[in-house]
Amino acid sequence: MLDGVKSKHILNIIFKNVKNKIKLKLLKYNNALLNRLEITEDDYKAYDSLKEFNKLFDINYSDIDIEEIDLNKKNIALDKVIYYLNQIKFKELKKLLLNSDYISDIKSLKDIQFNKLETLELSKNKISDINIFENVNMRNLKNLNLCENNISEIEVLEKVKFEKLKSLNLRGNKISDIKVLEKVNFRELKELYLSNNNITNYEILENVDFKNLEILTLGNNKISDINALEKFNFLELKELYLFKNNITDIEVLTRVKFDKLEILAIWENKISDISCLEDVNFKNLKELYLSKNEISDITVFEKVKFNNLEIITLSTNKIEDIKVLEKVNFKNMKSLYLSENNITDITVLENTKFENLENLSLDNNNIEDINVLEKVNFNKLKELYLESIKINNINVLQKVKFENLVMLSLYSINTNDFKPLEKANFKELKILQIYDNNITDINFLENVKFEKLEKLGLNKNKIEDINILSKVNFKELKELFLECNNISNIDVLEKVNFEKLEILTLWGNKASNINILEKVNFKKLKSLAIGQNKISDISVLEKVKFEKLEELYLNDNNISDINILEKVNFKEMKNLEIYLNDISDISVLEKVHFEKIEKLGLNQNKIQDITVLSKVNFKELKELYLEGNKISDMTIFEKVDFPKLENLGLHLNKIDLYSNALLISYLDYKIKNFTYAEQNLDD
């Protein structure tokens, strides 16, 4: 006779691989075989429950001995989840993910029977009351994620039995009082996330017993004074986040005992003086985030002891002089962000010792001359941001030695001549952004040697002729942005060799005829944006071969007839935008095959009758926009079946608020974002 472990293993194999239902029935009802394998009726009940579980949640688990169950984004009550989980008896379950957007009541957690559960995620829900945690049996819990809920009160943490807890995430709630933390028994805690709350008094952390704490986030609260940090006993702290507060003085950093600190994030505060960094003992610091402050003087960096620094962000400050960079000892520097300052002179870069630099951001400054780039020793540079500066030519790019460059951003500069790119040696380049430059001629693209290019941004220029695209060698291209130009003829798309193209944007041009789309070879296309043109006829959509299309933007055209949608083969469609047209009849929606659609924009048309909405099969629909039409009768919303609807726009129609008051009240309660009003745009 086989032992129980082997018999259950055999049962697992059978349920995973045997597709013949007759064999399953024979196995189930053959008592002799049952006895031989020592399989009990409870085992079968578990497997029956597993089938129901899979069906209910539209998933496919084949084994009850799994360690992780992911039910993210599933619209289902928690008590039903717990019921099935207990029925199936997932004895090995260690990780349960329930980030669904729908859960508000978690009282059923008291019934949970998973002794090995280590991770419970309930983030991005509507939970406000967590007192049930006092009664749950999760002694092995190590990670509890409750971020982005409506929690304001956390006193229950004093009573929970989570002695093995290592990570507690309360980010993005409404918590103001954290005094209970001095009473909790979380001696193993390594990560505490408290950002995006309403905390002003964080000094209580002076009394907590978190000797193993490695990560502390207090960003986006209402903290102005950080002097309490010197009393914190967090000797193992590696990451400290204090961003988006009202901090002005950081002198306390000279007295804190965070010798192992690797990341300090104090961006978006009101800091102007950073001279105290000279006396800070963060020898292990790797990342320093100081952007969006009021810093003008950075000479202190010559004296700091941050020899391991890899990332420094100084963007959006008041810095003019960066000459100190030639004196700093940041040999491991990989990312330097200096965008949105008042920098005019970057010649100092020639003398810097940033041999490992991978990312350099100089955008949105008053820089007129970038010729020094020819002399810098940035052989490992991968990303270069030069947008919105005042250079009148890019000739130096023919001479730079950035052979590993992957991303180059040159939008909004003072030249429309990009011919120098023909001689640039950027063989690894994958992203090129040259939009908003008044470019008219793109013939230079034929001669560039960017064979690995995946993303090309040519939007917001003055391009009329795109025929050169038939001659370019961009076989890896996945994203092409041509919006907001003067393009009227797109016939060249038939001849281009962009077999991997996934995103094509052509909105904001002058195209009226899109029949060429029937002949293009974009089998991997996921997003097509041709809104804001002069299109009236979309019958070609019946013939296109865009079987993977997920997003279609037809907005702001002259379309009145959408009946062709009945015949299109867009089974993956998730987002359809046809607003700002002349559509009055939407009865075709009953016949379309958009089972996966999540967003439908029909706003600002001439629609009166929406009764077809009760007949459509849009079970995944989350956003429906009907505002700015001529709708007066909204009673159809008593019958529609959109279980996941979160956003409904009905404002700027002819709906009478008084006669529909009850229905409006119901929809306002049921739908997260519901807008309505009486008048139409034409009134």
Residue ranges and their predicted role:
Residues 20-24, 31-118:
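LRR N-terminal entry segment and analogous cap-like coil->beta motifs
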Residues 85-89, 107-114, 131-138, 155-162, ...:
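A structural signal for leucine-rich repeat
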Residues 67-71, 96-98, 118-122, 141-146, ...:
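Conserved hydrophobic beta-strand positions in leucine-rich repeat
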Residues 1-29:
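N-terminal Skp1-binding subsegment of the F-box domain
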Residues 74-76, 101, 125, 149, ...:
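Conserved "Asn-ladder"/turn position within leucine-rich repeats
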Residues 18, 632-683:
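Leucine-rich solenoid repeat scaffolds
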